[in-house]
Amino acid sequence: MSAPVFFNPYLCGGAARRRNGCSTVDSRRGNGPTKKGKKSFLQVVPRGVIYDGEKGLIKKVTQHPPRMFYNNVQYLLEPQMSWPTLPCRETCRVGCGREQPLRFHTFDQIDSTVYADSVEQIFLGYRRHVVPCGNVIRMFGRTCDGSSVCVNVFGQPSYFYCEYDGSEGYLDNYLSTVLKETEDVTKIVFTLDAQRVHKYSLFGYNTKYIENLYRVTLNNWPVCKRLAQNLQSRGLRVYEAGVDPVARFCVDRKIPSFGWCVIKRFYARSSGLASFCDIEIDCEIGDVEADDSDMSWPEYRCASFDIECMSGGDRFPDSSMVDDIVIQISVICYAVGRSGAESDGVSGAEAAVREHQHLFTLGPCAPIPGTHVYEFPSEYELLLGFFIFFKAYSPDILTGYNINLFDIKYLLQRMEKIYHANVSEFTKLRFGGRFSIYVPVGNKPRNASSASIKVHCTGTVVLDMYPVCVAKTSAPNYKLETMAEMYLNEHKDDLSYKEIPPTFLANDNGRAVVGRYCIKDALLVKRLFEKLNYHYEAASVARLARIPLRSVIFEGQQIRIYSCILEEAGERNMILPSFLTAKRPGELATESSPVASFEEDSEQTSDSSLGEVSSQGSSDGGVGYQGATVLEPDVGFYDTPVAVFDFASLYPSIIMRHNLCYSTYLPLGRDDGLSDDDVFLLEFDDGTRYGFVREHVRKSILGELLARWLAKRKSVRKVLAECQDEVEKLILDKYQLALKVTCNAFYGFTGVSSGMMPCLPIAAAITRIGRDMLMSVVDYVNTYMGHAEFWLRYLGEEDLTGDALNVKVIYGDTDSVFVICGGVKCGSVLEHGEAIAGHITRALFREPIKLEFEKVFVNLMMICKKRYVGRIYGQTKLSMKGIELVRKTACEYVKSTVRNVLNMIFFEDDVSAGAVELSRMTMDDVKRHGVPSGFYRIVEALSNARDELYLNRVDVKKLVLSASLSQEVSAYKQQNLPHLRVIQRLAARREELPSVGDRVPYVLIAPPPGSSKNVPNYEISEDPGYVIEHKLPVNGEKYFEHVVKTVTNVLGPIIPKDCARKEKFLSYVLPQRVYVSRPFMPYACAANELVVACDDGGVMMGVYGIKPVMCGVSVTN
C-alpha cells in the first residue's frame, strides 16, 4: 500500500474520531467570501504519525490551504485569524486627547524611518515630520486596564556634533560630498542641516567652548549614523555619534524607558494602522510626559515556550537540514506585574488569558489534562500555527531555556530557510517589524551570559533564563534539570533525549507523553522566571539608565553608565566625544574611546561584570595601571577572633570624596590660572602625575550622580522596610539593587580599556587612593590597636581573656582588612566592632568614606591570597573563598569529603586543638611522636574515603567533574582535554552535543588492564550517563589523588612548615591499604590484619599503626 500524500490526523485517529467526525471552520476575519489562493508549500510529516511506529518522512508539495485541528474541528490558518482558545481582540477607540489624557506604561521602544509615501494614516498635523522622511519612535506598553498600546511619536531628530575648521556654508557642501561617497546612501532621501553651537567637551577640565563645533541634524537615523562614521574615518572629531533617536528622546525629554507616561494631546488612529495593538495613537515628542511618581506595573503578558525536534538521521537536529523537523512546541501563558488585589479590576477578557497551557503537535495526540492541544498535518503548518498564536496572544515578554541559541534560532531558520516565510509579519507591527537573531561572526563569548547573542522581536522582550541562571548561580552544569532541582526542588519528566523519537512515533498516547515532557520544560522555566525575578531587576536598571529593556538584557554594563553620563552632561551643556582609533601608550584614554553605540546590532565590546578590574590592570593597546591592592597574608590557622573591616562602597566613595571625573581631569602643564589649592594631585611611583580640580572649582558629574543615587537608594530602602504589598516590595527591592549595582559599575566603566569611555587617569587614581586608604588602616591598626588602652575605651576588663594582647592585620584585600584580636573575647569584638570601625573612620578619613565592621571569625584558616575559610561567630556554616568547595570544577564527592574535614576542624574542639598542635610541630616531632590524637579523626575520614573510592561504593553522580566549552571544539589548539574527548565520544555515538558556553560533565573511569599508571585524564574521561548505563568502574586512584590534593591545599597552614613536600604529608600519615581480589584472600590474610569484603567480589586489607605516620601507602589493584 502506498503512503498517503496528504495527512489528515482525523482520518487515522481511531474509530472514535471517525464516529465523531470533524467540522471545518474558516477562522479568517470577516464574513465575506475568502480568496482561494494557489500558493503551494512543502508538507513534511513523519510516517509514524500515520502508521504507528514507522520511521521516515513523507514529503509533498501541496496547494491546499494550511490548517490545524482543535477539538475535532478543522481551522484554516491565516495570519489574521482569530485563535479559537483566545478571546477576540477588538481595537479600542479613544478620543483625540483633548478631553482625557492617555496614561500608559511603556516597556519597549524602537525607532522607525517613515517616508512620505507610507501607507500609514498619519494625522495631517504630523505629516510634516515625515516629509520626505523622518524618525518615528514607537512606544509599546499597556494601560491600567491591560489594553496594549502603540504610541507613534513624531518629531525626534537624529543628530551628532563635529568640529570643522572651514566656513559654515562650506560645511554643507562637504557633508553632501561625503554622503555622495557613502555606500548605499545615495538612493535614500533625507534632509540635512548643520548649525553652529556652543558646547563644552566632557573630557578634561576646560572653561572654553569647543571651537568650530557644529550640530549636524538629519531626519534619517541610518544615514546619520553612516555619515558620522564616515566623518570619523576622515579624521574629523565627532561627538555622540552613536546615540540613536530612542536614546535621544528618553534622555533629552526625561522619558522613562520602563515606566508610566502621560499624553495629553494626541490623535487616535482608526485606519492605516501600523501595529496590531488594541490602542494606537500619534503624537509629537513634546506631548509625552513622564509620571515618575508611580513605580507599579500593569499586568504584562508572558509566554514560556519549549520546542522538541527530531532528526532525520542519527545526529543531533540541525535546523538547516530539511529532514530535521520540529515535532512539538509547548507554550505556557501567564501574567506578571500586578498583585492579586490590583488585578481584581482587570477585565474578564484579560483575566481569561492570564495563565493557560498550549501544545502544538504534529499528528493526532491523546488529550492532556489542562492543556489545549492543536494538531497539525505537517511541520510548516505547525510552525505557522505557532507564529499565528504568538501574534494573537501578543506576549510582552517571551522566555524559555537556551532559546537564544537554540529554540528561537531553530524556528526562525526553519521558517525562513526551509519554508521561505516572512516571520516579521508576526510581530506587533503590521510592517517594518523585526523578528531576528544576531550572532556576531568570529566573536567568541566568554560564557553563556555574554551579550554577544541578541534576539530582536519588535514589541516583545526576549528574556532567556539560561544566561540568567549562569550569571546568578555557581553550579557544575546549567542544564534545566539542575537549575530546577536547585531552585524549585522539582525535576523534568523522565524521558531521555534518545527516547523522544520512538515515543513520539509510537501512537497518540506516545505523542501525549512527549507533549507532557515538553509542557513540563516550559512550566519549569516559568517557575524559574518567577523565582529569580530577573525581569524586575532588569526593568529597574532600564528605568534608572533610560535605556530599553532589551539593551539591559543584551548590551551589558557599559551602555547603562554611558546613558546616565550622557543625560547628566547634557544638563551642563557638555557633550561626549566619540573615537574610532585604538588607544596608544601615553595618550589620554579619551583619545581612544570607541564609538558609543546604542544600535541594536552593534558589535561593540561591552563589559558584563560589575565593574571590577583585575590587579594586573589593562593590557589592551599597551596602556596599563596597577590595580587593587592585595596584601601578602600571614598564612596560618587562627583559633582566636579575627575581625573583618571593609569600606562601604569603596570606589564610589573615592570618586565622590576626591571629585574624580572626566570633566575635572586636568592635563598637567596646561595654564588654567588655578592655584595649588584648586587641584588634587596624585603622583605615582614611576613619576606619572594626574591632577583633578577640586569641588569648589567644578563639581564631578560622576560624583553627583553617585551621591544622588546613593541617597535615592537609602530612601527606597526606608520605604521598602515599611511596605506591605509583596509585588511593590519586590519592585522596590530590585530598584535599590539596580542603584547599588550601577554605582559599583562606575570604576569598571572608566577602567576597561575596551569599553565605551575608558579613562586611565580616573581608573589609576581610584586604585591608587584605594591602596593608600587600605595601607593607612593597616598602619593604624598595627600602631594603636595592640595596646590595652585602646580596647578599654570600648570594653571592660571582663571583655578581655587575660592573655597577652595580639592585635595586628593578617590580610588585606582591595577594600577589606582582617585583624587578629588575640586576648579579646569574640562576643565583645562583635558587640563593639561598629564603634571601633567608626573610631578608625573619624581618625583617618572624611565623608563619604566610611570603614564598617563586617564580621568576626571564631577561627580562621588563612591559606594564601584570595583563599581562606573560617567560622563566623554566631553562624553554623563556614565562610570560604577560593577553595574547591566553591569551585564549579570539583566533583561533589571531593567537596563533601573536604567539607567533612573542615567541619571537624572548625566545629570539633579536639580536632581543632589537634590542628593547632600539628601546626606548631616539626617533621621530626611527627616522626617521633606521630600526629596529635585530635588529628586521628581526619586520618580516619580520609581512609574511609579511599576505601569507598577503591571499592566502587560511591555514586557515580557524586564523581562528575565538568569543564566549560568556551568555543567550538575545532577552535581549541589543545585537543587533549577531558571534556573535548567526551564531546568527541558523544558525537561518535550520535548523541546530543553541548553548545558553546555549556559546562561539559565527565567521569574518570578505570583504564583498560595493562595501561600505564599515569594514564592521561583525557583518555579515561567519559560521559556520566554512559558510565551509569554500562556500569563502568571509576578510577578510584585518580579521585583519591584529587581528594588528597584538595585537602592538602586547604590544610596547608597546619602542615609542619619544614615539610619539604606538603603534598606528600597526608600520604605519610594515612594507614597502609592493600586491595586484592577475592581469590587471593587465603594467601593475603595475616593474623593482625583487618579484612573486609568488597562489593565487587574482592577484599580490602588494612594495617593500622599506633603511629600512623610510620605507615606508607602501597596499593595494588
Swiss-Prot record:
Q: Mind listing the UniProt keywords for this protein, alphabetically? A: DNA replication, DNA-binding, DNA-directed DNA polymerase, Host nucleus, Nucleotidyltransferase, Transferase, Viral DNA replication
Name the catalysed reactions: DNA(n) + a 2'-deoxyribonucleoside 5'-triphosphate = DNA(n+1) + diphosphate
Ranges for region Disordered? 591-621
Q: Which Pfam families match?
A: DNA_pol_B, DNA_pol_B_exo1
Q: Which domain of life is it from?
A: Viruses
What ranges does the record list as Low complexity composition bias?
606-618
What's the chief localization of this chain?
A: host cell
Q: Does the keyword Magnesium apply?
A: no
Query: Which SMART domains does the entry link to?
Result: POLBc
Query: Do the record's keywords include tRNA processing?
Result: no
Example GO CC term: the record gives:
host cell nucleus
Q: What class of enzyme is it?
A: transferase
Checking InterPro entries in the record gives: DNA-dir_DNA_pol_B, DNA-dir_DNA_pol_B_CS, DNA-dir_DNA_pol_B_exonuc, DNA-dir_DNA_pol_B_multi_dom, DNA/RNA_pol_sf, DNA_pol_B_thumb, DNA_pol_palm_dom_sf, DNA_pol_type-B
Q: According to the UniProt entry, what is the EC number of this protein? A: 2.7.7.7
What family does this chain come from, according to its entry?
Answer: Belongs to the DNA polymerase type-B family.
Name this polypeptide is given: DNA polymerase
Q: Which organism is it from?
A: Guinea pig cytomegalovirus (strain 22122) (GPCMV)
